[in-house]
Amino acid sequence: MNIHRSTPITIARYGRSRNKTQDFEELSSIRSAEPSQSFSPNLGSPSPPETPNLSHCVSCIGKYLLLEPLEGDHVFRAVHLHSGEELVCKVFEISCYQESLAPCFCLSAHSNINQITEILLGETKAYVFFERSYGDMHSFVRTCKKLREEEAARLFYQIASAVAHCHDGGLVLRDLKLRKFIFKDEERTRVKLESLEDAYILRGDDDSLSDKHGCPAYVSPEILNTSGSYSGKAADVWSLGVMLYTMLVGRYPFHDIEPSSLFSKIRRGQFNIPETLSPKAKCLIRSILRREPSERLTSQEILDHPWFSTDFSVSNSGFGAKEACDQLVPDVNMEENLDPFFN
């Protein structure tokens, strides 16, 4: 990971082309043809715009082009000027970027966790670059309705591996959900945890938390039932169980349009598993989605479950078939944060 201030640069902006994509040589010629515009002259460090323009124009940040926003006004599609490599750039206030990225700095690299490739520091903004992704797990499950067991096992193992690595490294993730995992390849065979910005850094072995952070559909019963502390790692594991169930069944184990009714179902911890799932898949789901936190598998124990070593082509050819079913995995606008319900 490179963290540095580059030499002084001139920031140029260009109106967006009618075409969604533009040839990089064309952008280069436009830049040389138009008069340059310095947004912060006479500074000894790079002077990126305070925030890349929200009207979908192109901004030059060091050796990168920042293109259209991907999420709000702080996540952008970016392209390396020389190699043409496509990346994702997140923009932070310079005063708080280290705090926001602290979990990234204290955790060793892992193949299933998104890695920072470079950080550029301006006067007021930090520009953090990540490798590009190819969609997220939530959208993938919505499109597929549900996954075959063999595919679900391959992807869920990677998801659980990322969570286990975080737990071993002293991090509790708190807001785990399918949307947090993104694909590393166009074939949708490799996934990674998109960010650690919501993670909590533990001080020692005690993983007790007291906040009500998370997404309603993925929240664990003990978070709803207690006004005191709870095990952050066990709550993460519950969220893993919700993810696995959703991948295999095509809907959440607990769902209701009314938050109060949804929370009542989660508190009871009762759910139905379709008979079409294999015995090992049912066993793993039940071993994770247990009301009592101490009875759940740990993230590391999940990785040792025999479901992952199943020869699906031989013993489970009849399980997990993609039958027609109602699509019950909601769109993004139904994935609200838990916080407002407890304020």
From Swiss-Prot:
GO biological process: negative regulation of fat cell differentiation; negative regulation of interleukin-10 production; positive regulation of proteasomal ubiquitin-dependent protein catabolic process; regulation of MAP kinase activity
Composition bias type Polar residues, residue spans: 29-45
Keyword Transcription: no
Domain Protein kinase: 61-308
Keywords, in A-Z order: Cytoplasm, Cytoskeleton, Protein kinase inhibitor
GO cellular component, one term: cytoskeleton
Pfam families according to UniProt: Pkinase
Gene3D superfamilies xref list: Phosphorylase Kinase, domain 1 (3.30.200.20), Transferase(Phosphotransferase) domain 1 (1.10.510.10)
Domain of life (superkingdom): Eukaryota
Free-text comment on this protein's domains from its UniProt entry: The protein kinase domain is predicted to be catalytically inactive.
Function: Interacts with MAPK kinases and regulates activation of MAP kinases. Does not display kinase activity.
Name the record gives this protein: Tribbles homolog 2
Organism name: Mus musculus
Lineage: Eukaryota, Metazoa, Chordata, Craniata, Vertebrata
